[in-house]
Amino acid sequence: MEYLLLLIGFVLLIKGADFFVEGSSSLAKILKVPSVIIGLTIVAMGTSAPEASVSINAALSGSNDIAISNVVGSNIFNGLVVVGICAFIAGFSTNRDILKRDMPVNIIITAILCFMFIDGRLSRIEGIILLAGMAAYITCMIISALKNREEAEDCKIMPLPKSLLYIAGGLIAVIFGGNLVVDKACIIAANFGVSQNFIGLTIVAIGTSLPELVTSIVATRKGDSGLALGNAIGSNIFNILFILGMSAAIQPLHVLSESLIDCIILLASGIVLFLFAFTKKTMSRWEGAACILMYVGYTAYLFR
């Protein structure tokens, strides 16, 4: 029964995020908000809504291990599995902006997070610093996009009542789904005698990363495999700056020594991914296979 409820929680998270993005994007268009701002804020937040709901709910309920391991585990999964599978299906060229801006930012903020973890806690002040970094990053992206006149793909406009219904329904589903996932993950961890940190790094992290995986595979099958790298790196930046920042700002988090090791592994995987993408400005199929094998090795390390 616990597994069924956990699955229902994941479904509510993913579908709720879809409804929230669709309703919010439609409302923003009704209010004449530029498409680029919609793409860089609402859609970005919606994609990471499952991770946000789980980590914030975990922080509020005192399950610090899940709040942190969910983000770290999701980021490792995004970088190695999501990008790895898409590169293995069809190698792709890497975008110049991602190489010069997003990937270095991802490495830098992950290194900063490792430094913050050293003292065994993520304080409220550190959470606010991460949130300020998120605001600065989004501002820079919006300015850059408007300067280069880049527009995100237009979303469909729904009637105002329907847009509001989608937003409200999506938020309720995401919040309820997040509560369900945290509660059932804790029970499953207790039943099997494993740590919440382990459950957060595996089952919860993979479950909340499913939207990124599905979106990227669909894009790859349509011939736009390069989108996978942008999705993964953008999601990872958002997860660290906004989700961990918000979680710590709400409730300071205790950090296990294992979480510091996992964060260092995340940093190493980010550097390897950057080197793969930087060489010849492409991600080849063998590099994708190498990423997948690295994740298999990491999973084996968790089961040690």
Where do the language-model regions lie?
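Hydrophobic alpha-helical segments, chiefly the membrane-spanning helices
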Residues: 1-304
